[in-house]
Amino acid sequence: ADIVPDGSIIVPDSMHLAARVGMEGTQCTAALKLLEKEGVLNLDAAYNLATEAYHADLAINNLQVHHFLPKDSIYTLTAKMSAKGQGVDVASRKTVAALNASLEKLQYGHWDISGVEAHAGLKSSVATVRLASDNVLLKMQGNADMRLDRSYLDGALDLNVEEVNLHKLGLVPRPLKHPFAFTMGAEARHDSLKLRLDAGDLNLRFRAHSTLKKLMEQSDKFVSILTKQIDERRLDHAALRQVLPSAGMHLEAGNQNPVSYFLAAKGISYNDFKLSFGFTPQVGINGRTAVHGLRMDSLQLDTIFFTVKQDTARMKLQGGVINGPKNPQFVFRSTLTGEVRNEDAELTVDYV
């Protein structure tokens, strides 16, 4: 029978459902069993109104979800979940909770997903999460923790991704020659933000001397002032520097990392890439980026670079493309040098 007019949700004729709800004093209980051909779903749960203690156990075995959602691409599902705890105020140090879940089998379209486990806990206002996946689409482990009794974001995240199968996920036309893998760590405290990403010979580091909320507020304020100054056709570099967040980013990459492998599958390659930028009210915006040995089809560019330096009166920019004597196509040097001052700008093009 259709539940919604478009037939996207239905109740199969072969379904049998038994449910029991009870209450004795302050103890509430519920049990449910669903049978649909070979599929079985069992739920057992309880909650105490006085102590706020609860538990819930859910087991699903070979349930054909497609029989309930015929317009979706979800088919067989086998999974388990259990939850146990006391208290419902997540900000209270007295609240405790534990959650365990596992996905043994999920058929979604042409994908078969299995080997996924999640564990979460809450104790003394500290929430923890552990996630693991071991299947042909994704092999990874992740850990995270966060304090819930802070007025700011206070937590950490660690990810170890051994392989993401981009070909089976339909993101690239053919299998990559090397695994798409990386490790990532992030940390937010009362006075700093840190991010690191390592993948082969690709290394990214980011750090800010503030909370995430303050960083977002400073960034929004900077964009707002800059937009207003652009509309008024007059830049005040000193005013812009005063609202800059204190942050820095450094990125280095060779040609042995997931990004280079992904680009290679698209017919793009390079020798190395470097980027380094810093932002502080004291020194303004300063940075440099460069790509060496960029190749796209028959085009080869030896060096592409860009630098920026700001003081209280101007922002100096320089960029260019250089092909050296050993370039198989043509040798040249093209540079752009400019200044963006408070009320005007200048740009010089040089081609040799």
Give the predicted meaning of each segment.
Residues 1-352:
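Membrane-proximal interfacial segments on either side of biological membranes
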